[in-house]
């Protein structure tokens, strides 16, 4: 999909760059694969804001996407590629030979009519899913499981991918787009190819209202708040904060490491994504 830039006939169109979605399905999603979705407004079960800058936005239906890909050795055909308001990637409707339908993340370089399959050892072509044990080294993958059978958790956003770079005991080594090198079990599933919609990051929404349609509210800087609201708040006139940048809860921000050093998953990370900053 290409990008569309607009002639500024209105102020909101000046600088506007959007994704051309003309080739996507224009109808409604499959009803049996959708659920209702209520707005949380960034609040948890106690009603407190746990995620700032959330609220409002257009109504959505949740599309049930198959991240597990455990329907082995049953071939499916991509019937259509659809827009999904709940994620940056596009989704593909797959119709299997036994009549079942499912949504999967649409990979790049796939089109309507392409065949996909999940198997212990499948062809290396975009959309096919298999465990790392049946995959050749060097394959570009997305929708990667961290625990066998849990469903894909890594490389699911638009344009993302990881590379399968080696085997180590019962583990597969993968290099993520952040630069991190980590291990996952060889039984974990992954889908061949990169995720669709790589131009997502090149969009320019042109006006604040488009972000509001997405349910994103304005970001207020801590330095313009009162002392009760933020560690950077207060002071007479404009002040520059007076301390190292911190979050509203006093944790260092702007690059300081705050990850717990005793996390169990640390032993599976061979090379940190921050290693290149340290000159390693």
From Swiss-Prot:
Biased composition (Basic residues): 254-280
Keyword terms, alphabetized: Ribonucleoprotein, Ribosomal protein, RNA-binding, rRNA-binding
Pfam families (alphabetical): Ribosomal_L2, Ribosomal_L2_C
InterPro entries reported for this sequence: NA-bd_OB-fold, Rib_uL2_dom2, Ribosomal_uL2, Ribosomal_uL2_bac/org-type, Ribosomal_uL2_C, Ribosomal_uL2_CS, Ribosomal_uL2_dom3, Ribosomal_uL2_RNA-bd_dom
Coiled coil: none
Alphabetical list of PROSITE patterns matching this protein: RIBOSOMAL_L2
GO biological process: cytoplasmic translation
Gene Ontology CC terms: large ribosomal subunit
Molecular function terms from GO: rRNA binding; structural constituent of ribosome; transferase activity
Gene3D superfamilies: 2.30.30.30, Nucleic acid-binding proteins, Ribosomal protein L2, domain 3
Similarity comment text for this entry: Belongs to the universal ribosomal protein uL2 family.
PANTHER family: LARGE RIBOSOMAL SUBUNIT PROTEIN UL2M, RIBOSOMAL PROTEIN L2
Subunit details: Part of the 50S ribosomal subunit. Forms a bridge to the 30S subunit in the 70S ribosome.
Functional description taken from the UniProt entry: One of the primary rRNA binding proteins. Required for association of the 30S and 50S subunits to form the 70S ribosome, for tRNA binding and peptide bond formation. It has been suggested to have peptidyltransferase activity; this is somewhat controversial. Makes several contacts with the 16S rRNA in the 70S ribosome.
Protein name, per record: Large ribosomal subunit protein uL2
Naturally occurring in which organism (per UniProt): Dinoroseobacter shibae (strain DSM 16493 / NCIMB 14021 / DFL 12)
Species lineage: Bacteria, Pseudomonadati, Pseudomonadota, Alphaproteobacteria, Rhodobacterales
Gene this chain is encoded by: rplB
């Amino acid at each position: 999909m290409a990008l569309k830039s607009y002639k500024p006939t209105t102020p909101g169109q000046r600088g506007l760059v959007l994704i051309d979605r003309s080739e996507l399905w224009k109808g409604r999603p499959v009803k049996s694969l959708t659920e209702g979705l209520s707005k949380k407004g960034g609040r948890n079960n106690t009603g407190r804001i746990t995620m700032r800058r959330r609220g409002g936005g257009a109504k959505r239906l949740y599309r049930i996407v198959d991240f597990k890909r455990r329907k082995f050795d049953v071939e499916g055909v991509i019937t259509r590629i659809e827009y999904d308001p709940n994620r940056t990637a596009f989704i593909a409707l797959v119709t299997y030979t036994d009549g079942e339908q499912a949504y999967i993340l649409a990979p790049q370089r796939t089109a309507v009519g392409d065949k996909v399959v999940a198997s212990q050892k499948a062809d290396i072509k975009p959309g096919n899913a298999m465990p790392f044990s049946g995959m050749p080294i060097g394959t570009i993958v997305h929708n990667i499981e961290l625990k066998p059978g849990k469903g894909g958790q890594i490389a699911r956003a638009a344009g993302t991918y990881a590379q399968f770079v080696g085997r180590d005991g019962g583990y597969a080594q993968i290099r993520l787009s952040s630069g991190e090198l980590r291990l996952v079990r060889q039984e974990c599933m992954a889908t061949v190819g990169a995720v669709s919609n790589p131009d997502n990051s090149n969009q320019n929404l042109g006006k604040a209202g488009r972000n509001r349609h997405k349910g994103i509210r304005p970001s207020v800087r801590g330095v313009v708040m009162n002392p009760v609201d933020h560690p950077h708040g207060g002071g007479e006139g404009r002040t520059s904060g007076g301390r190292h940048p911190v979050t509203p809860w006093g944790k260092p921000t702007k690059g300081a490491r705050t990850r717990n050093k005793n996390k169990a998953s640390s032993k599976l990370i061979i090379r940190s994504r921050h290693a290149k900053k340290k000159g390693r």
